[in-house]
């Protein structure tokens, strides 16, 4: 019985196998016959429809789905042959072995330093607004030169941002235009900016012309094509991204615990087919509609309904229920999946919103990855492990989440909030490669205030900057140099400048006194100056302009600078107290005369006031202490146009210094004690000091406020209501218990 069953099973299997071979052979022969008939009919101009029982040809069932700039547009006529792909790839990888050592001429940078030349714009050439902003940022920077013979780096005026052939911004015949440039030199020492490259269906990283030995500052660049220590990966930004300044991050205060309404969110397009569709098509597996809200829509492109699947209607309905901004500001983590290209606008949006980015874009070289440690600000995921993302982020400790969130705000404000910062960061990275002996280290790039405000030309030692004392375990300086700005001749021994000099010299923290003689009269004889226990150095300014008081003089031997106007009235006790306060806040301006700014709605401009109000945003440098690094930053970071304005008006230098320090620290200055007698309306009426009583003086300061705010691109000044007084100040206790007892008598 068992043998019969075995024979029956073998016979059935053999019959099935024979039938399979038979019908398969017929199908194969029919297919070959059909292809021959098609070939024959093609030659004779005839067409025969294929039988219904033929095997389906799946590529025909999936029609091309063509996006551009993340806005879907279908153009089924676009076809890329294998030969065209090979040509595109060859142009991409032709200079793949380029590095700074092999494709960059360092000798051009040795003579004049790091200078950048922008080619003159050619008549008739259209330039997109985004590229105009890039060129404007370069031309407004301290690196710019209009003389190509002084240049170390060259930037094209031809718009290379959008190299998608379907884009209306695409510049045709770029290859011949670039080759005709007499300074091109096969791209050597050239930098090319690019946001979009390639087109449907592959989105290769081909920019459409031979870049030769040029460097690429490129968005959505892959790790495979990225040339380390040569190219620069930049973020993908929209045409509405501000040119300068930009909005600050949305994190106004830290919440403990740092959890928001949603754990993980995303809202964006769902690509049904093609490159970039795999991850977005699978997001619904992770979406739970509660604390993980991942929304996609099929409604994009002209013919989206032709490609819709059974889930589209449900996804579209769910998509409309949520407001993207509300989700963004109430989420702990934001998913940043790849689009058609590796980069996404969601990346910068998440950074600004203090929503920790969860990256799902395998192979993307993250922006400025050469200097930024993204593990401190983002979660780097893997597209292949999508289903593990929720459990991964839930396992992150709250302390780590808070640190990640704070770092997103720092990176956004330091490097990404404007086109100017993106461009300057790119240039600073290249400069660090050229001058490696004074390049910034990882701590500078990843800690406040960031690489753009810490100039390595000042010093290669972090302890010489006021921002890293805690990181290095150092104590702030114990001595200061008093710099007195003198503009009136010395005619009497009772002049305020001499009393001020003696009071400063008596301070236990004073190392030396420098008198900056900006008076038109000759220097007084040495015996006219009072005898002091510390050295007194008199420097005669060559140009005798207002900005000269902030020059980085080699004579200043201490890190702390006590800046004084010649008619300031301060006692030794007040000097000592201000300096001890500054030692706790070495990165800020600490002093006595406070002023404030406000927005004038009627005039739609910024205003300046010296009224005694409950808050302030400036401490004038007529009686203030700050770090001497700000002298170097004032001289070498600020543009000549602002300093020339200050010198021509002989005014506003103190306002400009406050703008600079607040822009760097993102913090207000600190006022000490309630002293109010330092007022512009109470200054002397003689000689050059009469500028304080000049009716135009106050109007000039109003104008300066708006000019400075325009250059910075935003208002960096921050209001504060904090005033620091000595312990037991004005308390009803014995005067013997008070350290700075003389301050109460003033």
Swiss-Prot record:
Enzyme class: transferase
PTM statement from Swiss-Prot or TrEMBL: N-glycosylated.
Top-rank lineage group of the source organism: Eukaryota
Glycosylated residues (UniProt): 89, 330
Cystine bridges: 98-103, 109-152, 298-312, 334-355, 652-704
UniProt KW Transcription keyword: no
Membrane topology: Single-pass type II membrane protein
Quaternary structure and partners: Part of the heparan sulfate polymerase, a dimeric complex composed of EXT1 and EXT2. Could also form homooligomeric complexes. Interacts with NDST1.
Name the record gives this protein: Exostosin-1
